[in-house]
């Protein structure tokens, strides 16, 4: 019986490790697919655990910069710790601000990334988040929305906000809306 339990624990642990490796590859692929490298300005509007944010930061070269929007001071301190640990402080920054009223100038980011938009409640607030993303997106900038649902609604809202070049891609099994301002 102990042997069976031990085998089950090992299999579960290997499954979890495999899942984390696949997620990291997924984010690397998304960054590569968007050609997010070098001296570009990136806004990550939905930093969660910070791993994707750090992966994106590693793709940049100074003076390129990624700014991660965080919702509270605890998350801000955690992200600052990750930035320091990954040695990307020259090109990554955590900012505590409201995603429905960003504290950035118009058209200042080459890339804007939003993940987990379906978690924003109430649903009407998602439209406001997208409106702010479009506002800060530079001319010829790219907006990427990584989400598990509501893609058709997001496309409709982006068209309403004046974004015309919109495609839905599947990158490593993840649906991604890529919208380019032209």
Residue ranges and their predicted role:
Residues 37-38, 42, 97-112:
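A short acidic, Gly/Pro-enriched loop at the edge of an enzyme's catalytic core
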Residues 49-62:
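Conserved SAM-binding loop of SAM-dependent methyltransferases across substrates and taxa
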Residues 65-70:
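Conserved SAM-binding motif I beta-strand of class I
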Residues 87-99:
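Conserved SAM-binding strand-loop segment of SAM-dependent methyltransferases
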Residues 110-124:
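A short SAM/SAH-binding and catalytic strip from SAM-dependent methyltransferases
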Residues 126-139:
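A short glycine-rich, Lys/Arg-flanked "PGG" loop and its adjoining helix->strand segment in the class I
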Residues 140-147:
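Conserved beta-strand signature within the Rossmann-like core of class I S-adenosyl-L-methionine
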Residues 162-182:
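Core SAM-dependent methyltransferase catalytic element
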């Amino acid at each position: 019986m102990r042997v069976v339990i031990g085998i089950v624990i090992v299999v579960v642990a290997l499954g979890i490790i495999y899942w984390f490796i696949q997620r990291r590859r997924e984010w690397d692929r998304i960054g590569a697919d968007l050609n997010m490298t070098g001296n570009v300005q990136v806004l990550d509007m939905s930093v969660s655990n910070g791993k994707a944010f750090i992966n994106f930061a590693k793709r940049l070269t100074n003076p390129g910069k990624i700014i991660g929007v965080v919702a509270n001071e605890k998350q801000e301190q955690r992200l600052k710790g990750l930035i320091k640990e990954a040695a990307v402080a020259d090109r990554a920054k955590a900012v505590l601000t409201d995603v429905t009223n960003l504290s950035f100038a118009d058209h200042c980011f080459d890339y804007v990334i939003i993940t987990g938009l379906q978690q924003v409640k109430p649903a009407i607030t998602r439209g406001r988040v997208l409106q702010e993303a479009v506002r800060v997106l530079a001319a010829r900038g790219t907006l990427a929305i990584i989400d598990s649902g509501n893609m058709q609604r997001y496309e409709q809202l982006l068209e309403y906000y004046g974004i015309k070049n919109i495609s839905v891609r599947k990158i490593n099994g993840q649906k991604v809306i890529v919208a380019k301002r032209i």
